[in-house]
Amino acid sequence: MHNPILLTAICAVVSFFIGAIPFGLILGRVFNHTDIRKAGSGNIGTTNALRVAGPKVAALTLLLDCLKGAICVLIARPLIADLGHGFPVSIMAPGAAGDWMLGVICLAAVWGHIFSPYLNFHGGKGIAVGLGVILAWYWPIGLSLLGMFIVAVAITKFVSVGSLAAAIGLPIAACAVFPYSSLGLKFCMALIGITVVWAHRANIKKLMTGKESKLSFTKRVTEPDDQ
């Protein structure tokens, strides 16, 4: 297939549906016979899986959500490289003609997770799947954002603060590291950051009112959080 727009659209749709797989919900039901949407924040991501179902389910959720994001990029990369634009398959050099294509793939996977069609277009908050796509897209930026996340959580004890820091840092890092990348790529990275911040709107409200829960590896919750 040599039509870049059609190929990107097909890869984006596939990535959206892969990104939409609700591993947190599936693992909670398999290992704990629990619907993690019924307690805590009601989210299907790693943090709520930890709070409701425990460290094992949370670790597996984190791993699988990261992997599904990475897989979307790793599948699309050689297909896009085969278009004949001369992209190096190992890097897909941001700044090359067509670098926006992988940006669209990254965005589609994150949107699939946040707006999962399997859950009536509800889902997670995009952090783990976002980490997966960015590590697969350009791992130095992914590791930098992960480091930013870890430092922010270590200082504040709030996972949401680390998540927001990483989300805001993504478009900044992408523009700083690749100032000559296409406007399309920059736009996709900005949209990922904006969407992840939007997905944390309830957390932002809780942080402002002092109701946000701090990270705990031992405390379990069985009831929905107070909003």
State where each predicted segment sits:
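Interhelical loop and helix-boundary elements at the membrane-water interface
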Residues: H2, I18, F23-V73, I114-I127, ...
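Long C-terminal subdomains/extensions of small-metabolite kinases
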Residues: G130, V177-F178, L185-K186, A190-W198, ...
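Alpha-helical transmembrane segments of multi-pass membrane proteins
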Residues: S15-I18, R77, A108-H113, F149-V153, ...
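Loop-to-transmembrane alpha-helix initiation sites
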Residues: L143, V159-A166, Y180-I192
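Interfacial segments of multi-pass membrane proteins
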Residues: L50-P55, A76-L79, A108, K125-T156, ...
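Alpha-helical transmembrane segments of multi-pass membrane proteins, especially transporters
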Residues: A12, F16, T61-D65, G69, ...
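Helix-coil boundary and interhelical linker segments in multi-pass alpha-helical membrane proteins
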Residues: M1-I10, L74-V104, L135-I141, A176-C188
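A cytosolic-side transmembrane-helix exit/cap motif
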Residues: H122, L146-I150, S182-M189, K206-S213
